């Protein structure tokens, strides 16, 4: 999701000889895998889909999170200047939200096995998401940003706050924390249109996006998808509103997926394209939760999205393995 311009300040800092810097945005893969795992576990409960698929995806998401978490801590220890530069740059700063979102999504998978661990992870993720949204939005209000520095990743801090209520039912914190869920929805309702307007202005008036940022546009579909799930899980008395917000997410996917498919043909696979996975998986989960009100069409939509998201994640996994293999051979 970071362009060459965005990585310039980071690349200019010193690094250890032979070391390879792993950007914070790689936690986006954890987001996609964890949400798709949740979708398959829901499919097991609703349609008797194979439980093993969801379990394997959940294990992969947890292992990847641990690996990336350890790598991030190592980089803070050995390359602090480089990490600080990444966390401070206007284009990469919002991507830090992928870490907090991962911490908010993993409790959905952990809660049935270890409620205490799930609640601890959720608490860290919720505090981190709120603090980082406050910090990031404050930095935008101070100005001095260029149109070229705006990209769809600017929505990630907003999505982070919206994700806070998702695990509340699994953690058995409804209705105790229902006001927090209402705050998250209102936060998203306020800031999603504002940031989306900036992103559309960047697309209409700015230069073409670099290859690494092409998939980031699909983040525009994430806020309505997450909001629809929150409405169904925490505010079930508003089924039509949840269904309408889901349809908005589907519309945005239909609008943006063909554009990504067209623009990405001329480029090699980018690890940053994992950005595709979370909006697709989040919309899939929202469609599954709204199936009782969508009728047969809603069921078909949920199954279609589950198949599409699974296929996309499979392609992303294969592409990532190829990149890893090439990198290993190059060394």
Feature-to-residue mapping (PLM):
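Surface-exposed interaction/gating patches
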Residues: 168-169, 173-194, 200, 215, ...
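Structural signature of hydrophobic alpha-helical transmembrane segments
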Residues: 55-67, 116-130, 179-194, 240-251, ...
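Membrane helical hairpin/interfacial module
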Residues: 47-115
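Internal transmembrane alpha-helix with an interfacial aromatic "cap," most often the third helix
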Residues: 109-112, 132-145, 163-176, 191-208, ...
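Hydrophobic, membrane-facing alpha-helical anchors
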Residues: 2-19, 67-82, 128-142, 188-203, ...
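Extracellular/periplasmic helix-loop-helix junctions in multi-pass membrane proteins
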Residues: 45-52, 175-178, 235-241, 262-268, ...
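Juxtamembrane helix-loop boundaries in multi-pass membrane proteins
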Residues: 10-39, 58, 79-105, 122-125, ...
């Amino acid at each position: 999701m970071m362009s060459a311009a965005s990585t310039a300040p980071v690349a200019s800092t010193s690094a250890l000889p032979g070391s390879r810097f792993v950007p914070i945005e790689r936690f986006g893969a954890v987001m996609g895998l964890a949400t798709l795992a949740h979708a398959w576990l829901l499919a097991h409960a609703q349609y008797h889909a194979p439980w093993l698929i969801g379990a394997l995806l959940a294990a992969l998401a947890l292992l990847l999170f641990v690996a990336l978490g350890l790598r991030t801590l190592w980089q803070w220890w050995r390359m602090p200047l480089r990490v600080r530069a990444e966390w401070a740059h206007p284009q990469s700063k919002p991507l830090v939200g992928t870490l907090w979102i991962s911490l908010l999504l993993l409790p959905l998978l952990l809660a049935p096995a270890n409620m205490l661990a799930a609640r601890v992870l959720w608490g860290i993720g919720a505090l981190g998401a709120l603090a980082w949204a406050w910090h990031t939005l404050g930095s935008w209000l101070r100005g001095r940003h260029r149109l070229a520095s705006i990209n769809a990743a600017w929505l990630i801090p907003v999505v982070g706050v919206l994700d806070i209520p998702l695990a509340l039912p699994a953690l058995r914190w409804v209705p105790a924390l229902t006001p927090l869920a209402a705050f998250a929805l209102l936060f998203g309702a306020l800031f999603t249109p504002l940031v989306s307007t900036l992103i559309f202005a960047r697309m209409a008036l700015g230069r073409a996006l670099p290859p690494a940022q092409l998939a980031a546009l699909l983040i525009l579909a994430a806020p309505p998808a997450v909001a629809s799930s929150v409405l169904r899980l925490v505010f079930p008395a508003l089924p039509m509103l949840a269904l309408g917000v889901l349809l908005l997410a589907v519309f945005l996917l239909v609008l943006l997926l063909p554009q990504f498919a067209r623009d990405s043909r001329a480029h090699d696979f980018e690890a940053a394209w994992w950005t595709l996975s979370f909006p697709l998986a989040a919309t899939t989960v929202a469609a599954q939760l709204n199936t009782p009100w969508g009728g047969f069409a809603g069921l078909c939509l949920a199954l279609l999205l589950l198949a599409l998201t699974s296929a996309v994640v499979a392609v992303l996994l294969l592409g990532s393995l190829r990149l890893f293999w090439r990198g290993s051979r190059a060394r």
